[in-house]
Curated annotation (Swiss-Prot):
The gene is SEC13. This is Protein transport protein SEC13. WD repeats lie at residues 7-37, 51-83, 97-131, 147-178, 197-227, 244-274. GO terms for molecular function: structural molecule activity. It is a peripheral membrane protein. It comes from the Eukaryota. Component of the coat protein complex II (COPII) which promotes the formation of transport vesicles from the endoplasmic reticulum (ER). The coat has two main functions, the physical deformation of the endoplasmic reticulum membrane into vesicles and the selection of cargo molecules. It also functions as a component of the nuclear pore complex (NPC). NPC components, collectively referred to as nucleoporins (NUPs), can play the role of both NPC structural components and of docking or interaction partners for transiently associated nuclear transport factors.
Length: 289
């Protein structure tokens, strides 16, 4: 396990490994992003990226077929795109359509191209494609009335390749959006009620098995699992646990294979969960801090 010492001067909000597990990006309330090279249990700070004017909430690596590219989002309402060439990092694009904090960024499945999904406290969700370092005209939709906390892409779907994503907001709702070719925008396909407080995170499982899975984590101290099999058009929900979590559930994250779910909460614990053959979710342990 790699431990990053006092790299930042304030709270660290996100830490993400790149596709190959060789680089780690961290971001913080100190307004900076740090890039580390990872070699076994050793790490070396190689760059500090400065460009945001507020806390940086999240970072996301693009697929390596697009180069060494990182996106970051901040309380300052901006999404910045950073690129490394021959060991030198530069800001290559700025996406600034939002009027309030941008709370999450995620790259689409690489088959769709370098497309970024952004969720903001201004209630809007933006989808923007980057070509040769410059952003194209973004799609901006009204997502959740009081603010959008998170959004997550669906894995590429066969045979129709319809683009979908899920979002969670301060209106306690979870929504699924589908790209409409005729309208050239994303339209609301489903809206789920299940949480009694803000939805803090949403995560669509990358698995392309017979079922689709979405995990939603909430301020109400619950995590819900939404599932849909190929035969049914209806999403079913079940709570991850019978009892509420000890504190707010901040983040939900699937393993690459989509069969293990990690939940991090306000109690500073990360718990792991797996589905059993009866379709019930069981504890798979805790991550040692």
């Amino acid at each position: 396990m790699v431990t990053i010492g006092n790299a930042h001067d304030d709270l660290i909000h996100d830490a993400v490994l790149d596709y190959y597990g060789r680089r780690l990006a961290t971001c913080s309330s100190d307004k900076t992003i740090k890039i580390f090279e990872i070699d076994g249990e050793n790490q070396r700070l190689v760059e500090t990226l400065i460009g945001h004017e507020g806390p940086v909430w999240q970072v996301a690596w693009a697929h390596p077929k697009f180069g060494v590219i990182l996106a970051s989002c901040s309380y300052d309402g901006k999404v910045l795109i950073w690129k490394e060439d021959n060991g030198v990092w530069n800001k290559v694009a700025e996406h600034s359509v939002h009027q309030a904090s941008v709370n999450s960024v995620s790259w689409a499945p690489h088959e769709y191209g370098p497309v970024l999904l952004c969720a903001s406290s201004d209630g809007k969700i933006s989808i923007v494609e980057f070509k040769d370092g410059g952003a194209l005209e973004p799609i901006v939709i009204q997502g959740h009335a009081i603010g959008v906390n998170a959004a997550s892409w669906a894995p590429i779907s066969l045979p129709d390749n319809t683009r979908r994503f899920v979002s969670g907001g301060c209106d306690n709702l979870v929504k699924i959006w589908r790209y409409d070719d005729a309208a050239k925008t994303f339209i609301e396909e489903e809206a789920f009620q299940g949480h009694s407080d803000w939805v803090r995170d949403v995560a669509w499982s990358p698995s392309r098995l017979s079922k689709s899975y979405i995990a939603t984590a909430s301020q109400d101290r619950t995590v819900l699992i939404w599932t849909k099999d190929g035969k049914s058009n209806k999403w079913e929900k079940q709570p991850l646990t019978k009892e509420k979590f000890p504190d707010v559930c901040w983040r939900a994250s699937w393993s690459l294979s989509g069969n293990v779910l990690a939940i991090s909460g306000g109690d500073n614990k990360v718990t792991l969960w797996k589905e059993n053959i009866q379709g019930k979710w069981e504890s798979a342990g805790e991550v040692d801090q």
